[in-house]
A protein has these predicted regions:
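A short glycine/serine-rich beta->alpha loop
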Residues: 83-88, 266-267, 377-380
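C-terminal segment of classical bacterial N-terminal signal peptides
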Residues: 18-27
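Conserved serine DD-peptidase/penicillin-binding transpeptidase domain
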Residues: 29-43, 47-50, 54-56, 105-367, ...
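Small-residue-rich helix-loop
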Residues: 79-81, 334-490
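A short, well-structured edge-of-sheet supersecondary motif
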Residues: 56-82, 296
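Short active-site loop at a secondary-structure junction
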Residues: 81-101
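Bacterial N-terminal signal peptides that target proteins for export
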Residues: 1-11
Length: 490
């Protein structure tokens, strides 16, 4: 669950079923953390090993697994290596593999199309193809196109969700992740990132918090049990949200102070196809188009296309995927890879997409033995990859014509994306482009460095099995990266 508090910090505890979840530690997309300020200096490549060892061999990390590989971008010469060919849970660094394959196989200008076909007799068929950027704005555009065609009434609207085959939620994802906005379902009809919101508004002391739904239609799908309360200004604030396995009951507990700003809670939809149809009915109504029966089917024949919208080009989708570590986008791109392949009845879209990733990475020179993938985002703990896999991918992509698009999609140290709050006022600021990753006990960072006194560098650093807070691990990783930016030939 993504919970936003405006103007005032709020201590939050989100509870799903009977388990308490520290949601910030579960997210595959990495959080930002400011690195310690480091003065600019130089280090010889021959001294690098000793300097890195001094960081990772601290007693603080005695129980931690480190995987590190540092090489010049232009060659396979190793500047530093530690368990670089052993498996680690990569977290969101895995997105580097998914996006590399998508860019190679689909091309930077690839777009995902959502179409409406006229099948005659007042029947329209809408075909979703898993566009993760689709929003209410695009639904309104579709409704306007239908109005321009002279359509004022639709007797039946058929939603064909056959484009993406298989489970809408990866079965290897953990339950608490599935209940959070970063674990939203992935299907043919993704709308508003398959997330809905509700706002909790403080009232007079002793009164329940007011629950305000941003989507009145969505409110009708839930039974809400509100056990929250408004408290005096000197009291702590916290919110407990319980969602039952059936997905039909929301229990709201906890308290906000009377002077608190409203809190906005994002939750994943549980019926994305029908969520799409409900929202589309609303869009049609604003154009004075009446809609009769709606139906979800898997397959069918498309006739004349009378309306469509398209996603931004893949080059822009990659930026959202990598810079903001968007899980939904990464999973949608994995399925887009499958959509361009012949359909196999016995395989899901994820199966086919992962095969496409493997084929693409092999062409880039990545050893297939260096990874085991089960999703496209890195949210699953069953994903395994070696630091060498990421270095091989980064180097391979740098040699392709689309390498500049790939690199431009990455967060930039101290400037952009999930690295915006890290490396500020260090020698790494502005010259490191890298992908972050975070799960509980896992922190990773892999990317490129334009070392000012050395040739360009490619690196991968992965930490697993750690009991230390992610902030501590990031600071250590950042120290190592700063060392790499200070490399010079001696």
């Amino acid at each position: 669950v993504r919970l936003k508090i405006f103007n005032q910090p709020l201590g939050v505890l989100l509870i799903f079923l009977t388990s308490q979840i520290g949601f910030s530690s579960r997210v595959a997309k990495a959080q930002t953390q400011v690195a310690p300020t480091t003065s600019t200096k130089s280090i010889c490549s021959t001294q690098l090993g000793t300097a890195i060892d001094a960081v990772i061999n601290r007693p603080l990390f005695s129980r931690v697994r480190w995987g590190i590989l540092v090489q010049p971008l232009s060659s396979g010469q190793t500047l530093y290596s530690r368990d670089a060919q052993k498996y680690f849970i990569p977290a969101s660094n895995l997105k580097l593999l998914t996006t590399a394959a998508a860019l190679q196989q689909l091309g930077a200008n690839f777009r995902i199309r959502t179409s409406i076909y006229q099948n005659g007799n007042g029947v329209l068929r809408v075909v979703g193809r898993g566009d993760p950027s689709l929003s209410d704005t695009q639904l309104q555009t579709l409704a306007q196109q239908l109005k321009q065609k002279g359509i004022t009434q639709i007797q039946r609207l058929i939603a064909d969700d056959s484009y993406i085959q298989g489970d809408i939620v990866n079965p290897t994802w953990q339950w608490e992740d599935v209940q959070s906005d970063y674990g939203a379902p992935v299907n043919s009809f993704i709308l508003n990132q398959n997330i809905f919101s509700l706002k909790l508004v403080p009232q007079a002391v002793g009164k329940s918090l007011q629950v305000v739904w941003t989507d009145v239609g969505e409110a009708k799908q839930w039974r809400t049990i509100n056990q929250s309360v408004t408290v005096a200004q000197n009291q702590p604030s916290y919110i407990n949200v319980t969602r039952e396995l059936s997905g039909t009951v929301l229990r709201i507990q906890g308290q906000l102070t009377t002077n608190s700003e409203p809190s906005l809670i994002d939750l994943p939809v549980v019926d994305p196809n029908y969520y799409f149809l409900r929202r589309f009915r609303t869009a049609l109504a604003t154009e004075k188009i009446t809609l009769g029966q709606t139906l979800v089917v898997n397959g069918g024949v498309n006739q004349e296309e009378i309306a469509f919208v398209e996603s931004p080009p893949l080059s822009e989708l990659l930026m959202e995927t990598l810079q903001n570590s968007n899980n939904l986008y990464a999973e949608a791109l994995l399925r887009a890879l499958a959509g361009e392949k012949p359909r196999v009845k016995t395989k899901t879209s994820v199966d086919v997409g992962l095969e496409a990733v493997k084929a693409s990475l092999t062409q880039l020179g990545v050893d297939p033995a260096n990874y085991i993938l089960v999703d496209g985002s890195g949210l699953s703990r069953r994903n395994l990859a070696t630091p060498e896999a990421f270095v091989q991918t980064l180097r391979g992509m740098a040699r392709t014509p689309a390498g500049y698009v790939y690199r431009a999609s990455l967060p930039v140290a101290g400037k952009i994306g999930t690295l915006k709050g890290r490396f500020q006022n260090t020698s790494a600021e502005g010259i490191v482009q890298a992908k972050t990753g975070t799960l509980t006990g896992v922190v990773s960072l892999s990317g490129y460095i334009n070392a000012p006194k050395y040739e360009p560098i490619v690196f991968s650093i992965i930490v697993n099995q750690s009991e230390q807070p992610a902030t501590i691990l990031r600071q250590a990783i950042d120290e190592i990266v700063v060392l790499l930016t200070q490399l010079q030939r001696c």
